[in-house]
Amino acid sequence: IGVATQLAVLAATDIEHGPIECLFTVDEETGLTGAFALQEGFMDGDILINLDSEDEGELFIGCAGGANTTAEFTYQPIEAPQDYFFFSVAIKGLSGGHSGDDINKNRANANKLLNRFLSQLNAKYDFYLCKIDGGNLHNAIPREATALCAVPMKDKEPVRIDMNIYTAEIENEFSVTEPNLRTELSSESACATAIDRDTVDKLLKSVYAVHNGVYAWSQDMEGLVETSSNLASIKMVDGKIKIVTSQRSSILSSRKDMSEMIRSAFELGGATVTTGDGYPGWKPNPSSPILKVAIESYQRLFGVEPKVKAIHAGLECGLFLEKYPSLDMFSTGPTLRGVHSPDERMLIPTVDKFWRHLLDILIHVPVK
């Protein structure tokens, strides 16, 4: 919608505005690579209106910075007893959502729920873990996770009973935020190999120990998450188990501290851990001149004052500001819901208000 809006402005011949540039970036959702590649001197303007927000009537003036911390466990394949009961365990139907915007909503993390049950099985039975897979995008709360396991045939029914008990427990814990949560336990064909026992123990304990969710709330803006971490994905690739986590914070030192906590838990489990360079946050400027123009415009058009907020998610604005420190900017957009999930959608009536507001701002931006 941001791209379409810019193209509409460029194509129109009846829109009043001063000198204007439109900046298009690629891969915002997967790594901010377009914004990272922006060079100093590429743009001439000193006012930027970011069109990437998700709530009409709310103007954003700050965001969190973030970085990914990745752990890799190297395992040895061992022979799986062919006379054991092989079964898959799955966590499904979770709400998911954006790991910044939705991290404060107490939604379940499929990787954590699966690991919790596998840890119970590992402690109680002669347990083999053959495969594990959960989550996908680093910036999404995982909705599904699965594992292929094996226990002695005599423990087939006890495992099913344990699953029923565990399902009732987590359904009770997440009765409000995860109404569609479901678990599945299905018989499977035998798997030739499994992950060695030592790695399984260390993997399950490390994932159990790693923090997931809100860690600290902002002391400056009520209701704003300051620091968080998301256990985004668990994948088996080329003889290794790769776990991607994502840390966010509006305070750089707190984000680094959170990343070190994650690193410590995984390194204690014997994993190799790396933390990426990350991306910067955007410190709010309530005295922004363009923000004043936007607020007055909204009041003039709709008779109410827009909400001015900061967001616990990564916007490209932090990177723009790093390259252009004098930029005066805010972020806006129509209302979107279910972002970063299969349920992603846009509330169409909000597009008209968003469009009218943008055009009025363009009219009233002071021309130097």
Regions found by a protein language model. Give the residues of each.
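A short beta-alpha structural unit
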Residues: 147-148, 182-193, 230-234, 242-252, ...
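Redox- and metal-dependent alpha/beta enzyme cores, enriched for Fe-S-associated oxidoreductases
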Residues: 253-272, 281
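His/Asp/Glu-rich mid-to-C-terminal helical/loop segments that flank catalytic regions of hydrolases
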Residues: 40-41, 107-124, 152-156, 201-208, ...
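Zn-dependent metallopeptidase/amidohydrolase metal-coordination segment
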Residues: 219, 226-239, 302-361
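Acidic/histidine-rich catalytic neighborhood of metal-dependent amide-processing enzymes
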Residues: 1-82, 130, 215-218, 222, ...
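Acidic-enriched catalytic cores of C-N bond-cleaving enzymes acting on peptides and small amides
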Residues: 6, 62, 79-84, 103-133, ...
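Alpha-helical metal-binding/catalytic segments enriched in His/Glu/Asp
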Residues: 1-29, 87-91, 98, 105-121, ...
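Active-site-adjacent substrate-binding region
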Residues: 102, 109-111, 116-132, 284-327
